[in-house]
């Protein structure tokens, strides 16, 4: 539906047990499928057989998904932090994702809450545009992250270091001084997740584009 309408697509990547990136938002299967357990505990072949709730589609491998899109619309790829600590632990996800991205012919960008993952993408696939995903980094949402680290991330201190050109910020905190500063400096500002035309209208006073679900917007911006 997104491709037919000309909308860009935002996807999330997790890593299977055998080191293959798959398109899935959650760390656990329970909310979005009839199965249960961790994505990381299953091989990609097993995940590809798990049906998503509300349809006949299964969890796709990243490379197969990108082959299907084939450059018809832009794709925004979020690398999910793999340990919840937003630290500097190197995972196989960055390398596996960048291997696919380097071969892809079409508009694409990569982003993450974890700036260390984006820094590694800068080394592995420097030609791919990069960005940071942001929110308030509260202790409630990020219980495994130290207070010092959360404050550092909220201040967006890594934006220039990783060569970012955009941020994607939570809708509820778009009015922060840091976002205003970034926009003035030339950064593209996206936001997530918009769930109505009313929210979209309000958000677009501040942002360049929105990640949306549950409704069809009047334009593709």
Give the positions of each predicted feature:
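C-terminal active-site rim and adjoining tail of enzyme catalytic domains
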Residues: 133, 141-221
